[in-house]
Amino acid sequence: MAETSSSSSQTTPETGTYAIVEASGQQFWVQPNRYYDLDRLHADVDAKITLDKVLLVKNGDAATIGKPYVQGASVELKVMAHRRGQKVIVYKMRPKKKTRRKNGHRQELTRVMVESISVGGKAIS
């Protein structure tokens, strides 16, 4: 049986640079040069957004944990597009009655690209 070895140049969650940020009342694990869907933000397409509520920053082997936030840490985002999520169907029915209600909902989302993670004004990615 052939052995497989993983390349050390790949960015994995254990060895790479990442941050855990708070946005839209949720926590997101973000890595540079990846995109994420957040709840709709009031920003134009191609606008830059800075998130200052950073809970954790990991750079290689060094990790910085905030209490509750890391001081001087920020994540730079670029708004790529405004979009809508998948449709969720809500169906309510009362048995033995002629009561049925069907509603659909699509969440308004903003797709953002993580451009950089910085601590103390110095970009680490």
From Swiss-Prot:
GO cellular component terms given for this protein: cytoplasm; ribonucleoprotein complex; ribosome
Assembly, per entry: Part of the 50S ribosomal subunit. Contacts protein L20.
Recorded GO MF terms: rRNA binding; structural constituent of ribosome
Family: Belongs to the bacterial ribosomal protein bL21 family.
SUPFAM superfamilies, per the entry: L21p-like
Organism name: Synechococcus sp. (strain CC9311)
Official protein name in the record: Large ribosomal subunit protein bL21
NCBIfam families according to UniProt: L21
Ribonucleoprotein keyword on record: yes
Keywords: Ribonucleoprotein, Ribosomal protein, RNA-binding, rRNA-binding
Upper lineage: Bacteria, Bacillati, Cyanobacteriota, Cyanophyceae, Synechococcales
Name of one Pfam family that matches: Ribosomal_L21p
GO terms of biological process kind: translation
Signal peptide start-end: none
Function statement: This protein binds to 23S rRNA in the presence of protein L20.
